[in-house]
Amino acid sequence: MSHLADSRLSNTALSVLDLAPIRQGGSAADTFKETVALAQQAERLGFSRYWLAEHHNIEGIASAATSVLIGHVAGQTERIRVGSGGIMLPNHPPLVIAEQFG
């Protein structure tokens, strides 16, 4: 890789989008621990943002309460910015969305 390309990549902000998948044989509690571990590793590697997406009624996905999971991850990281990578707007009153994510 050329020096110019290398310097451009080093200035690129990287993010993670986590759906909090429950691996086969695992539990939601395992997933939450793994999500925190992934966020901490992303932070150590210099990623700038960690996004969590909301999903409901999907077997194998544990991110139904996005705002709670965001707080859980943010409370166990130091610098990485943690936020919502997707909210199902019809499922929530507008004021709740504004208060939690505004």
Task: Locate predicted features.
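Glycine-rich anion/phosphate-binding loops
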Residues: 29-34, 90-102
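N-terminal beta1-alpha1-beta2 module of alpha/beta enzyme domains
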Residues: 1-82
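The substrate-binding groove and active-site-proximal loops of carbohydrate-active enzymes
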Residues: 83-91
